C-alpha cells in the first residue's frame, strides 16, 4: 500500500484561521493524504503563565510567547477542521494535554499523534489509547528503553498505533537522522513504522519510503522566513508536491520480490538487442541439426542462444532457409495444428515497418497500425 503522507501544519498558521484554511487548500493541491495540527490548553500544559515565566530558561519563554500568540482556540480549530472536511481529507491532531484530547474526541477526530516530547508521558498515552483511535507516536529525543516502555503500555491497552522515527533537532543534521533505526522500531513495536522529518529538503523522506516507511510527516508552510520554530524546516507547497510525486514514483519502482518477468519495454529491446539462433545453411525437413548448422546472431526474434544444446541433434519438422531464425516450435516433435481465425468485423495489428510484409501475406489483416518516429 502507498505511504500515508501528512502535511504537518502544526502552528504554522500563525494563529490565523484564514491562514490555516489557506494552508489546508495548498496541502490538498500538493497531494497530501492528511493535514495535522496541534492543540494545547495552555493552563493545563504549562506550570507558569504570564509574568511568572521570568524564572524560566529563555528558550521556554520564547516558546511560551510564540504559543500564546500563534495557538488557535478549540472553537477556531473546529472551524479549520470543518474546512478540511470539505476536501474529504483526513484530519489528524497532536494533543498536548488531557483537555485537548477530550476536545478532539468531542469533535470526532480521525486520529491523534503523540509528539516526541510526550513519549514518556504515560498518562497522556493511556488517555489517548483509551479512546480507540489510530495513534501515531513519534520517538524523537527518546532512549530505547523509553520507547520499549511506551510500546508495552500501548500494547497492553490494545491501542492501534504506528511508530515514527524522528530526530528532534531543527534542522536535523543528516548524520543524525538514522533511517536504519526504522527496522529496529518495527521490531520493537511489531507495527507499521514511518518517518517524521525535521531536516532540510525532502530527499530523506523519499529514502525513508524506499526503506519501508509507510507514513511520512513533513512540516508545511508558505514562507520559511516566518516567525516560529517550524517554518525553517518546513516544505513550501511546490516542494511538498514534488516530494509526493517522487515518493509515488519510488513506490512504483520498488515493485515486489516475485519471480522476475520481462517488462513490456524490455520485450522490444530483447528483440532489438538480444541474439538468436540462426541457420547457417538450408536445412530440409527431416534433417538432423548439427552444431555447425547454427550461429548466434542479432536480432533476438528467434530462439535464445541458451537453447543451443536442446536444438542440436533434433530432427527438423520444417524447412529452414539459410539465415532464418529457429523458434521454440523447433524444439517440439510436431508443429501443432494451425488454426484458421475468422472475425465478424474488420481487424488489424500493430506492426513494425521491417516485418509487416511477410505478416500481411500470411494473415491478411484489414488494417495495420504503424508507430512513427524520426
Description of each model-found segment:
Residues 1-374:
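Catalytic cores and adjacent flexible loops of soluble metabolic enzymes
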Amino acid at each position: 500500500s502507498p505511504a500515508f503522507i501528512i502535511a504537518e501544519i502544526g502552528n504554522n498558521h500563525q494563529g490565523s484561521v484564514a491562514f490555516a484554511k489557506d494552508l489546508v487548500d495548498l496541502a490538498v493541491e500538493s497531494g497530501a493524504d492528511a493535514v495535522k495540527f496541534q492543540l494545547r490548553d495552555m493552563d493545563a500544559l504549562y506550570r507558569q503563565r504570564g509574568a511568572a515565566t521570568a524564572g524560566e530558561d529563555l528558550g521556554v519563554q520564547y516558546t511560551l510567547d510564540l504559543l500564546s500568540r500563534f495557538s488557535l482556540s478549540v472553537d477556531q480549530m473546529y472551524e479549520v477542521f470543518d474546512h478540511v472536511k470539505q476536501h474529504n481529507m483526513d484530519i489528524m491532531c497532536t494533543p498536548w494535554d488531557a483537555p485537548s484530547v477530550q476536545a478532539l474526541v468531542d469533535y470526532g477526530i480521525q486520529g491523534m499523534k503523540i509528539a516526541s516530547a510526550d513519549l514518556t508521558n504515560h498518562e497522556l498515552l493511556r488517555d489517548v489509547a483509551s479512546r480507540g483511535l489510530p495513534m501515531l507516536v513519534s520517538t524523537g529525543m527518546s532512549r530505547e528503553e523509553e520507547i520499549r516502555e511506551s510500546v508495552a503500555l500501548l500494547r497492553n491497552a490494545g491501542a492501534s498505533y504506528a511508530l515514527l522515527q524522528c530526530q528532534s533537532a531543527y534542522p536535523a543534521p543528516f548524520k543524525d537522522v538514522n533511517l536504519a533505526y526504522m527496522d529496529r522500531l518495527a521490531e520493537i513495536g511489531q507495527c507499521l513504522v514511518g518517518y517524521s522529518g525535521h531536516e532540510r529538503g525532502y530527499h530523506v523522506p523519499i529514502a525513508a519510503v524506499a526503506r519501508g516507511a509507510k507514513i511520512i510527516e513533513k512540516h508545511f508552510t508558505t514562507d520559511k522566513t516566518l516567525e516560529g520554530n517550524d517554518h525553517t524546516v518546513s516544505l513550501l507547497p511546490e516542494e511538498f508536491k514534488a516530494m509526493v510525486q517522487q515518493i509515488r514514483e519510488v513506490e512504483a519502482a520498488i515493485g515486489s520480490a516475485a519471480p522476475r518477468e520481462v517488462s513490456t519495454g524490455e520485450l522490444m529491446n530483447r528483440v532489438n538487442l538480444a541474439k538468436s539462433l540462426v541457420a547457417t545453411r538450408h536445412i530440409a525437413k527431416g534433417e538432423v541439426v548439427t552444431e555447425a548448422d547454427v550461429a548466434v546472431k542479432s536480432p533476438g526474434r528467434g530462439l535464445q542462444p541458451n537453447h543451443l544444446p536442446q536444438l542440436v541433434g533434433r530432427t527438423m519438422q520444417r524447412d529452414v532457409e539459410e539465415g532464418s531464425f529457429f523458434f521454440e516450435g523447433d524444439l517440439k516433435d510436431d508443429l501443432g495444428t494451425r488454426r484458421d481465425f475468422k472475425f465478424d468485423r474488420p481487424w488489424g495489428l500493430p506492426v513494425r515497418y521491417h516485418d509487416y510484409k511477410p505478416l500481411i501475406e500470411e494473415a491478411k489483416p484489414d488494417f495495420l497500425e504503424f508507430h512513427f518516429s524520426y
